[in-house]
Amino acid sequence: TPGTEAPAEMNFFFPQFSSLCMAENCSHNLHNLLTLRGAQVRDARAWAHYLDEAIGLFAGESDLVFTSHHWPVWGRERLLAYMKKQRDMYRYLHDQTVRLMNKGLTGIEIAETLQLPEELAREWYNRGYYGSVSHNVKAIYQRYMGWFDANPAHLHPLTPVEAGKKYVEFMGGADALLANAREAYGKGDYRWVAQVVDHLVFADPDNKEARALQADALEQLGYQAENATWRNFYLTGAMELRDGVVESAAAGVKMPPDLVRSLSPATIFDAMAVHLNGPNAAGKTITVNLRFTDTGQDYHLILENCVLNHGEGTVDGADATLSLPRTTLDALVAGDSDPAAAFTSGEVSVEGDGEKLGLLFSLVDADEFWFNIVTP
């Protein structure tokens, strides 16, 4: 079932048990068509199609349906009703979003307009505890239309910081904005408070009154959210406003060695490429051959035009040749081996211009694990 809950997924039937496993394609809530943590948009139409296919192939022979993360449904009649309403939920969201999109509504407008019909919405397994009608509708719009809603005012907006400063000025200054926002808060208009005070927080992140009011508004939105992921985002945002970005030991978690071993060399080199600091690489050209002494595989890396390309085999005229076992590369990537120790022990050797090799690796940035979300 490619393109549904995951890029690669499958439903499978156990005939000896009259049992059908639906992986994550049929669950006891409305699932995400776009996970809020960030990913490519999933295909609601394909999701409904594969549910329909599973019903046709297996529902008539199944006495039990179960999923990866949720509890089973017993009984042929009950499981058929469950699967059909899950199917129709995704199909309704898809078809009605496209219908309204073709009438000229934007993703935000559709999300405020579209609701599931009562016969689907009343089933607790169709409720938005994880995905939501609102952000799934926006995801369907995004899948077909992208980020731009065709309004040229949205084509090249100012950054949140620059726009925030101008919004605050237009609203009569920070004190006037806060006075109006507190009045709106008192009326329970928390969505509007969060939207307005966000401008002041980005214009003046040291404004304690703005941070406190914004945190209170986000907290109230979190308490009111049926959706667990929305609640978590709201409450985490409130925590950042009150306490700053709170770091934890999770930042020190290493990549699992078995995961690193499963990566192809091309995937590792692609990961290097997206970590290359392009501006710092300006004007630099470096070519490195890389030999895996245990597998006999050869590759090359070429830095030019501020881009790191790679390919199989060696190239003539390389600045340096790096030789090491693939297992050593895996250990270095996983953080289980010290580069200096690997060179000292002879596991890793370099022929040619070692300084250029060092320069190449110095241009590869490390990820910033902790960063601001609701503050600039």
PLM region spans:
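Metallo-beta-lactamase
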Residues: 2-103
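A generic alpha-helix preference that emphasizes hydrophobic side chains
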Residues: 9, 44, 107, 224, ...
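Generic signal for short, ordered secondary-structure residues
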Residues: 26, 33, 72, 76-79, ...
